[in-house]
Every structure is written in C-alpha cells, then in structure tokens.
Amino acid sequence: MKFSKVGQVSLVSAIALILASAFTACNPVTIDYVFVAGNRENPGQIQVFLADRVSGALSKVGSPISSGGVTPISEAVSTDYQHLYVANQGDNTLVEFTIGGSGSLTSTKTVTMSAEGNTPVAIAMNAAGTLLYVANTYQAGCSKAVSGAATCNGGALAVFPVGSDGSLGAAVSNGGLSYVPVGINPTAVNPLTDGSAVYVANYNPTSGIGYLNGFAATSGGALTSIAGSPFASGVKPVGIASDPTSRFVYVTDFAQNQLIAYSIIDQGVLHPLINGPFKTGNQPSAIVVDPRGRYIYLANELDNSVSAYAIDLATGTPSAAVNTTGSSTNTTGTQPVAILVDPGFGRYVYTANFLDNSLSGFQINPNTGTLSISQNGPYPSVGQPAALASVPHGNHSIQVNQP
C-alpha cells in the first residue's frame, strides 16, 4: 500500500493526537508532590500524593512508608527539592529522606537529638537551603520547663547545617551549647527569606502571655538575640509566617482568635501594625503566605475552615475582604492542623485534618485570593495527619510581588 503526501500528513497528525491523548490519560500532568505525615501509627507514616495541574486534585502514590520514628510532627524540604526532613516528636529524631523523580522517598539518615534539646515541635529550612532550624519543647536533659528557673527554664532552638548533598551536620554551637534557649512552650519557627533573622513563637500559660523570640542569624547558623526580644505576641501564638520580601511577619493567636501582623524594622526588630490584630475564625493555628507574597491563608481548628487575606504590598496589612463571611467559608475536614500552598504554581491550598484523617484542597483565584474547593476532595490520608510538605514536579518559576 502506498500513501499520498496528504495521507502521510494526516497519519502523522493522527498518531500525534493519539500519543498526546494517551499521555494525558496516563499522566495527570503533575505539578507537585505532597507529603503528609501522620502520627496515629507507631512508627509514624508518610503518604505521598501527586497534585494535578488543572484541578489541584490529589492522588495517592503507592502505600504509606515509615516516618522513621514516633509521632511525626513537622516536615521541611530542601530548597533543591531533593530531600525531605521529618521531625518525630516521640523519639526526638530527625529523619532525612531523598526524594525520587516520582515522589518516592528513601530514608538516608537519622539524627537522634539529645544535647540539642528534645521533644521537637517544628522545623524549618532557611531559604538558602543550608540550615535546618529545629524548635524543641525542652532543653537538653530536661523533661519540663519552668519560666525563671535556674535550669530547664524554657525550650531550645537547634540549628543543623545542611550539606550540598542534603545531609545534616552536627548542630551549630551557640555560646557553648548545641542550641539557643527560647521561652517555654515553643510552638513554631520561621526564618526570614533573606536569612537575616529567625523567630520562635512560645507562650506562658501561667501569665497568659505569648512571645516571639527573635534572633539575628548568620549564614553559618550563629544566633544572637535581637534588641527588644522577646516581642509580645498575644496569648497563645502557634503559627508564624513571613512574606517573601522579609518585611512582614504574621502570627496566629490560638487563644484570642486573631492574626497579629508585624513590620520588620532595623536589625530584625518587630513592630506591630497599628491597625491590627485582625479577626480570624476560631482557634487559628497553622499559617502560610503564598509564594508571590500576595495572600495569607490560615487554618481554624475549631471551625474546620481556612481564612484568607489579601496583603497590602506597601504596608503589609492583611485584608479579609477575600474572606468576608469568615469561618462559614472554605470548609475543611475536622481539625485542620497544617496548611501549605503548592510550590509549583502557587495555585492550590491544602490542609491536613487531624481528626478525620483527611486532606482538604482549594484552588486559589490568582486575581482575588479567594478559594474554591478542589475536585474529589477531601482526600483520605494516613491516620492523624499532622504535617505537610510539598515539592514541585518539573521546573516552575514564581515571581514575588514587590511593593
């Protein structure tokens, strides 16, 4: 049989369409891999999900794997997106995983903390990908913390150097210790994007006062207290986020249902915005700023909802105009305790819902910041999901908005 040129062109076109259709059908055009850590099982578990570019819908990748320890509580990823770090609260371990091309995880190293403090509550990677900050509930050798005591008088912030291969080194020495002391009951840690400072939230239930410990940071991990630190921060601050230009810090006050906003002035000093605090839903906890620095999203644990705010790029003021009906919108599963915005395109918000073992997903309107529920959610996850992390699939570029 002999084809004419027209027939050959038609055949080539048909084959191309068939191949494109087959590729689309087999591949949901993944933009991100999402890692959720749950602490119901012993050891804890991590489930990998892929996020669809068009809908934001999540699909499981394989079966859950061990978190490498007991009670995983926080996750962080390297800035090259090749490594995942998990803090296991129950046995004081930090576990490093390599991330495969399909989102698969392989455990490569475990660090058991002792001199660095114990009972981790939060971890965070600096923007350079060279330091991992770990907030521990107790100082070395302590199982309680009493404010004002001679010893065991607070929590501990440890700083681990991260090698070019993603491996964790020995904790940086600060004043002869493998940590710097912070207030009692630390809850969250946040390094600024420019690397100049890091902040730790903590609260004193006896006095009913919350604080942020602020530290000036060097590229090598040395920390020195910022003038005026600790900074007053409501009653029970439990979540911290900062904008990508390192000009503003945002904190959730779990006890007073409010969002506290600060401008960062000279040398990392925090100054509360004059028109704050700002109303949230009930029991706000986890908080995130989108990669462009335009919107804030926070999880309300009691309301089972997400509150959304637009950021005034000049002043840092959060406006709830994108979420005018408060907690009655953006419904999640039961007790959302973790939240993230996808790093691939910054178009989707996900929450980990602790009590009903699920993830909720929302699509962001890039022009307004409003949320709409993603397809087929909520998504069943591992038991008692407590931490979320994500890496983009492929190369994506997100432009940070400047004032």
Give the label of every model feature segment.
Residues M1-V6:
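N-terminal secretory signal peptides that target proteins for export/translocation
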Residues S10-A22:
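Bacterial N-terminal signal peptides
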Residues A22-P403:
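Predominantly soluble domains enriched in secretory-pathway, periplasmic, or organellar proteins
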